[in-house]
Amino acid sequence: MQWNEIDKTISKTFEFNSYLDGIDFVNEIANLAEQENHHPDIKIGYCKVTISLTTHDAGALTEKDYKLAKLIDDLKT
């Protein structure tokens, strides 16, 4: 599944075998976000995690968003 671009945001939903697998993934993303100093919006559901990226201070998508999206995708491979 690819990232979906809507307005000034890209988002993607990841599915997991268990709720805790999703939580582990969110923790990995949190560490990555701190390293990159770029923080996504995260929605946690049952066996699903939705990540949304935008550069708030720019009011638009920037290279930071696409870079973090790639790094997040790399966590799942």
Task: Name each region found by the language model.
Residues M1-T9:
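Short aromatic-glycine-(Arg/Gly/Cys) micro-motifs in beta-strand/loop hairpins
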Residues N4-E5, I42-I44:
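Short beta-strand
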Residues I10-N17:
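Short, well-ordered beta-strand elements within core beta-sheets of diverse protein domains
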Residues N27-E28, K70:
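Solvent-exposed alpha-helix faces
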Residues A33-K43, K70-T77:
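A short N-terminal helical cap/helix-turn-helix that marks the beginning
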Residues I51-T77:
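C-terminal structural segments of small proteins and small subunits
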